Structures are given as C-alpha cells and as structure tokens.
Amino acid sequence: MMETALLRYCVNFSGHKKISAHQRSNSEIPKTSPGGCEDEWCARVLSRRSVMASGLVSSTTALAFPREGLAVVKQGLLAGRVPGLSEPDEEGWRTYRRPDEKSGGHGVGWSPIIPYAFSVPQDWNEVPVSIADLGGTEIDLRFASPKEGRLSVIVAPVLRFADNLGDDVKIENIGQPAKVINAFGPEVIGENVEGKVLSSNVAEHDGRLYYQFELEPPHVLITATAAGNRLYLFSVTGNGLQWKRHYKDLKRIASSFRIV
C-alpha cells in the first residue's frame, strides 16, 4: 500500500518542472507546488520503500504464523547432517553421539551431561523436543522414523529420587532391575508399570551395567543406566504394525545405548 501510494504520487506529478536539488532532503517527498518527481529520485525512494515494506510483511508473517516460522528455522537447523550423527555404515545404520557442546544441565549446580550414544537405521532423524511433552525438560532428545517408530532419552537427576547416592552413581546403587523399573518406568510411559513388564535383562559394557526391559502394549523397550549424578532412560517404541514389522530393528536400537 505504501509503495502503491508513492508510485501514484510520482505518476501524478510526472511531466512537471523538475524540483531543484536544494529544495528537497533525503527524507522529504517533494511538495505539490510547481515542481515534479525526478525519475531517478522516485526509483530510489520506491526501492527503499520496497525494502521497508518487504521487511514489514516478513515480520508480520512471522508473528501471525509463529509455528510455521519456527518450523522453517528448525528445518534449516536440521537440514543436511545432524550434529552428532555419523554417516551410514555398510548396513545403512548411523551412530548418534550427544555433542559435548549441546546445552542441558537441569539447573544451577549440575555438572554437564555425560554424553551417550546409540545406533539407528538411516531413515531415523532427530525431532524437536517440547517442554509440554511427557517428562518435560528432562527429555534430552527425540528421534523418529515414519516407518519404524520413535525413541526418546530422559536424563533425570537422581537427587529427585534419593539424596545419598553421591556424584558418581551406578545403576546398581539405585537398586535391582525390578525396583528401578517400578520407580522410573512411569517417567517413560506416564503410568504405573506394575504387571506390564514382559522381560528384563542386565547387560554390562565397559564395566557399566544397563538394565533392559520390554513392556507390554503399548509396546516399549527401555534401557536404563546411571552416570555422574543422573539416571538415563532410553526408550524405543512403535505402534502395533511397526512393532510387528520392525521389532528386530527396534530391539537392536534399544540394545545399542551406551554412556561414552
């Protein structure tokens, strides 16, 4: 509208005597008294007005459609190689390692989160984490595949559950597998897990224990361990069809979780 009005002004005064240079300033439109609109000056002003109008339209669009704007920003950040995610190996699997510089710490006084790693098929990608999600700010990461399922990593301070475990906690210090899943399973599925555990297993890698659980439908695999002053809950899930078709891959993903 601003640009159209200015263009109409310039057209209306074309053909009149040119205004002298000392009668106008850079920020002033010529008066309607004898004089006119120089083509070069009009073009320069219109160009400046176009830039201002374009900026105004862009700002208004971002305010009116914040979700779309944020989605574009997020898409730009995630385009190409995701930070922490390796190139596919010969089987088409990639390894994600939490970047050392990634933010997160759950409050003043907490040490940096000790990095973790896991492997996923090539079509799995990181998705945004919302504070409105189950688990709130303790969800450190989400990945998903439209075909196979989704996963999340919850990193919870153990001080929430016990205050005498120190700053270098092992999962066995918290308790046996049954105690851990009953206490922390609700952090993952949002409800009591009593009677829902189909199987449990204890694995050891590089001297660290990992408790592995499979829960009944809605299907979920949970790997739990502890490091520093935090408990790590790695969950992998899918709908009924995904579970049936891709159980082997989902199981492999869940078993790949490591503290590094």
UniProtKB/Swiss-Prot annotation:
The keyword Glycoprotein does not apply. SUPFAM superfamilies: Mog1p/PsbP-like. It is found in: Plastid, Chloroplast thylakoid lumen. One of its GO terms (cellular component) is extrinsic component of membrane. GO terms for biological process: photosynthesis. This is PsbP domain-containing protein 4, chloroplastic. InterPro entries: Mog1/PsbP_a/b/a-sand (IPR016123), PsbP_C (IPR002683). The lineage of its organism: Eukaryota, Viridiplantae, Streptophyta, Embryophyta, Tracheophyta.
